[in-house]
A protein has these predicted regions:
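N-terminal pre-domain/capping segments
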Residues: 1-103, 134, 138-139, 145-146, ...
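Active-site beta-loop-alpha junctions enriched in small/polar residues
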Residues: 9-11, 45-47, 73-78, 110-114, ...
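Short, flexible, mixed-charge acidic loops at enzyme active sites
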Residues: 19-23, 115-125, 227-239
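Acidic/histidine-rich catalytic cores of soluble enzymes
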Residues: 42, 137-253
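A short, acidic, amphipathic alpha-helical segment used as a generic capping/interface helix at domain edges
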Residues: 251-265
Length: 301
């Protein structure tokens, strides 16, 4: 049975070091609103956003009758010198989830999105010249496997890779390449529908192409008009976020009805996590969460 979660990023709790960080909501308010709006799971958010000791973490999550389903771990994977600290950070988070008895949770690995100027400026319009070289691909793939292997060997948790704009694994071509270069038993795919659409792809095609690798799913919609406005004004990824490029579910161009039909056909039974990435202080996250949950109900979930 597919279960529906939400995540702190829908409340503006993002991994980026932004001026708007001061507007972030506290974890108790976020968890209260996730529960109140009809979701049954959450992801962890940034390290330190929620309690970082297992008893306290489990107490807060159980208090709201939620499950912890994953934790986002950004790593500069194209830089070999950053792999070891990536392992350390992933193991720190995996230990917390394991010690809190969330043994089905995923490490949601990603590039260090937003750190590369060219990729951040050109989110949604990446050209071939902006992609990794063959040598960089080897380094990147090695880093993902190194982290995933360390996590499963030490704590038994699985790792999925999150496609994401403003990072090196954004386009369908890049996602295909990473899946080709990595062990299918070691690394799964966290397919984010909105980022995939923003990156120039059709999520339905991605599901068909990677159905054996998709272990975790993020539901996010995409508004191409906001993306075009950002492009026309020379704005980067964060400018597109401010314009609402990731709109409420059903308001963009992602065909969720067909996606759900295909997932059911493929017998997908894991979590779907709603992520409506917004900057801290943007909009009314609780209202967005209500509308997104109501929309998902129209899909039979």
């Amino acid at each position: 049975m597919i279960k529906i979660a939400n995540a702190p990023c829908s409340w503006g709790v993002l991994e980026f070091d932004l001026a708007e960080k001061s507007k972030e909501k506290g974890f108790q308010e976020v968890l209260n609103e996730i529960e109140a709006t009809g979701y049954v799971g959450t992801e962890l958010g940034d390290w330190g956003f929620m309690p970082t000791e297992p008893i306290g973490l489990r107490k807060e999550i159980q208090k709201r009758k939620l499950e912890l389903v994953g934790a986002f771990v950004p790593v500069d994977l194209s830089n070999k010198d950053k792999h070891d600290i990536g392992v350390v950070n992933a193991l720190k988070i995996a230990k917390l989830m394991s010690d809190a008895n969330y043994n089905e949770s995923f490490i949601v690995l990603a590039d260090d999105n937003g750190s590369n100027f060219e990729r951040t400026l050109n989110a949604g319009r990446v050209e071939k010249s902006m992609m990794l070289s063959e040598e960089q691909w080897k380094v990147f793939a090695h880093g993902t496997e190194k982290i995933a292997r360390a996590v499963i060997e030490k704590y038994g948790l699985r790792t999925v890779f999150h496609n994401h704009c403003a990072g090196f694994i954004e386009t369908p071509e890049e996602i295909n390449k990473l899946m080709e270069l990595t062990d299918p038993d070691l690394l799964g795919l966290c397919l984010d529908m909105g980022h995939y659409a923003f990156g120039g792809g059709d999520p339905l095609v991605a599901i068909e192409n990677h159905k054996e690798r998709i272990w975790h799913i993020h539901f996010k919609d995409y508004d191409p008009l906001s993306a075009k406005a950002a492009k026309d004004e020379g704005e980067d990824y964060f400018g597109a976020l401010k314009r609402g490029v990731f709109c409420e579910l059903g308001e963009g161009i992602v065909d969720f009805q067909s996606i759900v039909s295909l997932l059911k056909k493929l017998n997908y039974k894991d979590w779907i996590v709603v992520e409506q990435d917004v900057l801290p202080g943007m909009g009314n996250p609780k209202n967005h969460a209500i509308k997104n949950r109501n929309y998902i109900k129209t899909l039979g979930l």
